[in-house]
Structures are given as structure tokens and as C-alpha cells.
Amino acid sequence: MAAAAAAVVGWLGWVLAAFCLGSTAGEAAPAPGAGLLNFCTEEDSAPGAGSLRGRAAPEATLCLRLFCSGLANSSWTWVAAEGAGCPEGGRATEPEEAAAPTGEWRALLRLRAEAGHPRSALLAVRVEPGGGAAEEAAPPWALGLGAAGLLALAAVARGLQLSALALAPAEVQVLRESGSEAERAAARRLEPARRWAGCALGALLLLASLAQAALAVLLYGAAGQRAVPAVLGCAGLVFLVGEVLPAAVSGRWALALAPRALGLSRLAVLLTLPVALPVGQLLELAARPGRLRERVLELARGGGDPYSDLSKGVLRSRTVEDVLTPLEDCFMLDSGTVLDFSVLASIMQSGHTRIPVYEEERSNIVDMLYLKDLAIVEPEDCTPLSTITRFYNHPLHFVFNDTKLDAVLEEFKRGKSHLAIVQKVNNEGEGDPFYEVLGLVTLEDVIEEIIKSEILDESEDYSDTKVRKKTVALGAPLKRKEEFSLFKVSDDEYKVKISPQLLLATQRFLSREVDVFSPLRVSEKVLLHLLKHPSVNQEVTFDESNRLAAHHYLYQRSQPVDYFILILQGRVEVEIGKEGLKFENGAFTYYGVSALTAPSSAHQSPVSSRQLIRHDVQPEPADGTRSCTYCPDYTVRALSDLQLIKVTRLQYLNALLATRAQSLPPSPENAELQAIPGSQTRLLGDKSRETAGSTNSRPSIPVEESPGRNPGV
């Protein structure tokens, strides 16, 4: 409202300037006096036209037709001798007859030439005292100073209006409470001035209007009383100096200039107090200071909800058929599926929490499986999928293809479901109409339509194929997605049966808890293939009739060994030291770490999963030049049937070489170091045996072999 009032006052200022221009034009124009334009004689023998100076015969009577102006201004015409002046208030020579006006611009004058006195005569007219010559114009320097002063006054008034009075009281309070130090100081000085802001605004508007009107009058006089140049010049100067320049300066340094200009604002109010006071009261009544608070409260209540624009635009103009995922692109399960390890692995890799279940054909969706329903399902039980779906019996959510997105979003918000099955009535061809399933629509599809962007997550099976874009490669490599199917192998690959879950747990335990198998030494992929080797997975059958049988002893005191053992199932008895201290251990305890590394002493104690030894984890060089002998100072004996992991020193060294080969780029020089997953490079084993035999005087300890397979990894 304050800006509108300022615009109205500015318009009134221009009207006042135009009125002053008209009044000045009326006062500055001289009164219409008599002026001779031309004359001619009426006799045929005389010249047809003459100038102001003519020649006549003696005693001749002349009849002159005068063309002059100002005949109605009490003027008359007479003939005066050349060189004679015009007496004040009288005539120099009485004409024979006075000039008789015959029109607005014409008059008839009769003269008689005297004989014997040839002389020249001048035709003269009288002008009344009101029609004198115009006053002299002011000097150019005075006009320039006056115009500059008026422009400066208009610019200062406009600048004070834009700087000191532009901030609302609420904005000043916000700056005083939460602004910077400079802003707080400026706000404290401006806050009292906002109390008489209406009077100050009225005073500044009045001064700006007066300055612009006076400038228009001044330029009109300087332009020779020509209105068009005066108006254009005044408008250009006021626009550039009085509007643009204050707006540019105040827009950047408003808070810095406003506190320093408060004195000028008070002076303007004092000079124009009789007019500024009532105008200020009027502006304060029209400003409605509570409007800002009402708008803030409306936004706080949610009246200015930005979602309304989205719902009126995109969501109400598009249907679910525009954003659905076709049925052939959806991840679904058959109702006759058995939940074994491979099926559960595929569900986990899909990354979805809701999976449709169909019967016979994909368009016949009968159930919905939630990922949380599989929390208590064991892969070894091979539970039928129909058993799980009948137990939970999740409802299905169907929508028609012409349903608007805003309606679907409201249903999703109510928690009914975050996945809907889109169907339509197919009445094509002969026969009764039927429902045809087109695809699926999810909450993610609706959100992508709102934000007009693809949501990239770990799975995109339900993403909109119509707007799917190629994923931009990231600068940093993504973390490898866990491939659970690596742990699912054929049953005939093991001599000892090991479940995929136990294989996964063993691989993670060794890579995280045992330093010699950490990813820095042995990669997870190589370790996995090592654990899947038939000679590594072994069983010990406990003989109740002969508890002290030789095959019950995994380690014996002072007997050299070259293998590492991890107990997976069963219990063992450990006897330590000369005192013969005995204790029992169970699953996931391991022994013989020093057998895989460079021996630091002749005897080492057993290592459990709760007590790691850091000083014996440096691996021996792969060339096998050092001794492979390790003599434990403890005895480990089975107390029940055991399932264990047994890794020999040669197998461990081959795993180190395979890991090193994976980290090297492929080239002819390192071709011998290439390790193929799931197979064995015989060259590595042969070279290791040859090197060990050449550096050790006694034969190396043989490595377990299985038919058709090589002994290492």
C-alpha cells in the first residue's frame, strides 16, 4: 500500500508540473500588440506591393491596404518623419483618416503627400503598455545550478524513501534480533524512525514532487518556451538521476546509508509538516501493518502449502498408466516356488520389500510377499512360498489405469499400501469384458513424477522405463554388491557337506578375525575358493571305543606340522605346557597360525578366536626358501565328531600368490601368477614343491590330495 501511495503522489507531481508549464506559458507570452506585417496600394497606377519604406508623388492621396496584427489592442497607425521619435502618449502626424480595420489582420489607411517638402516618412503603430518586450532570460550558469539543485533534491528524497523507509517494522525487528553486528546496530537506529515513517514518507514525496515540477518549469523557460523539448529533457533527467541512481545506490548500501540519513528525513518532515502530517496519517491507515503477521500465520497453519501447486499441476493431469512399470519388467515369484537358498538369494539381490506372487501366468497376481515375512524362514527347510503367503495373507491393492496420481498418492499416504496393481477393463473383441493387469505402480513412481527426476537406488526393477536414463558413472568405484550365489555350490563338490550359511560365516570370520587371512593378504574371493576346496573341508569321526585313537589327535606336542585348523562343529581338548593344563574348546576356535607364517620360536601355544597373536602374522616369502617346520607345545584331541577347516602351508602360499596375481595387470611377465577361480594352477604347486625340496635337506611334508584335483589353490 505504501508503494501504491508513493506512485499516486508521483503521478500527481507530474500533473502539477504540467499545470505549472501551462500557467507559465500563459503568463510569459506577451499581450497581442500592433505589428505591421506588409502593405500595398489600392490604385492601379501605384506599385502592387511595397515594403515598409515607399515613394509617392506630391499632393497625391494614397490608399494603403495594411496587413498587421494587434488591431484590437487599441492601436492606431500614423506616418512619422524619418528620424522623428514617437512622443509619449500622442501621435507624430495626424493622418487624413484613421486606419479602418476591415478584418482581423487587415486595415485600410488613406494618406496625402505634401507638396514642396519632399522627405521620407515612416509608418508607425502604437503598442499599449501591456504588450512590451519580454524580459531577458537568465544566464546559462544560473539555469544549470538551478537544474542541478532540483535534481539533487529529487534524488535525495527518492533515496531516503528507498533506504530508510523500505524496511517494514517486522524486518527491522528480525535484523535487530538475528542479524550481524552491523545489521543489529543499523536496526537499533532505524527502529525509532519507523514510528513516524508515514510522516517522513509524505514529506519526501512532497519534496520530490515539488522538485520535479520546478525542474519542468525551469527547462521550459530554458528551451525557449517550447513544451516538447522541456518535457523530454525533464523526464530523462528525473528518470536517470531521480529514480535509477537512488535505486541503484540504496539497493546495495541501504542499511549503511539509512541510519546516517535520518537527520535529513527529520528536516524534510519539519519543512513540510502541515502537509506531511495528514498525508502520513492517511498512508498509515492504508498500510495495514498486521498484514505481514497474517501471512506468516497463514503459512504456519499450512495455508500456503506448496504441495497444492504440484497436486493441481502434475498429479491431477497424469494417470497411473503414464508412470506404471510394465508387467514383464517386474520382479515376481510363482506361487509354487520353494524358498531354498537360491530363491532367497535372488530375493535379497532384487532389493525390493514387496514382491507380487502370481499363479500360472504373470497377469494373475494372487498374493503379495513382504521381505519381512522371510525373517524366520530357514533355507534348509525349503518352505513353499504358498505357505508363507497364506499365513500372512496381505491384501492386494488394485487401481484402474485412468486413476489420477493425486488419488493414488492419497491412498499411499493413508498406509493402505505402497504398491498398487494397475488394471483396466478389456472389452475388445467378442465375449464378456474382463480385467487385464497392465503393470505395477509404486510410491517411488509418484515421487519421481513430482520431482521430475529418476531416483537411483540399489534396484531399478520397478523404475519407469519410459523415462529411464543411463546412469552416470561415478568418480569413485561403488562397493561390490554381495553375491550370495557364490556360496551356493553343487552338493557333489564337497566330500564334507557344508551349508552355504556356514561357508559364508567361515569366510567372514577368517577375513575379519584372523590376521593371516585378512583382505590385505588374501582377497575374499581367493579365500572363498580356498574354503570350497575339498581337501580343506574335513571331518573327524570320534570313536567312542578308542578315545585315544591316533586320528583323534589334531596336534601333538613337539610334533612338526604345516597346517592351520579352524573348528567348525564339535569339541576338542587342549593340553598345554609341561604341567599338562587341560581345557575344552568348541566351534570357531583355531590353532596353528604360526604354521602358515615365519616361525618366531620353536614352540608356540594354541590360538583361540578370542586371543590373537600379532607377532607371528608376517607371511614367509613365497619362494619357499625358509623352513616350513612348526612344532607346537600343546596337544589338541577331539572329544566328539568334528567338522573343521584345514589349510596347509603350501595352500596358504598359493593363496597369497593368487591374490598378488589378481592385483597385477595382465601381461606376459606375470602370466604364471594368474589364478583362475574354481580351478588350480599346477605350475604354482610344482614350483613350490621344487623350491621347497631344493632348500630343505629332508623331504617336505606331503600335501593332501583328492582324486582329480590338485593340492593347492
Curated annotation (Swiss-Prot):
Membrane spanning residue stretches: 7-29, 137-157, 199-219, 227-247, 267-287
CC annotations in GO: plasma membrane
Family: Belongs to the ACDP family.
Tissue specificity as recorded in UniProt: Widely expressed with highest levels in brain, kidney, liver, lung and heart.
PANTHER family xref list: METAL TRANSPORTER CNNM (PTHR12064), METAL TRANSPORTER CNNM3 (PTHR12064:SF27)
Domain of life of the source: Eukaryota
The protein's name: Metal transporter CNNM3
Entries under Gene3D superfamilies matching the protein: CBS-domain
Record domain CNNM transmembrane: where: 136-314
Chief location category: membrane
Keywords: CBS domain, Cell membrane, Glycoprotein, Ion transport, Membrane, Phosphoprotein, Repeat, Transmembrane, Transmembrane helix, Transport
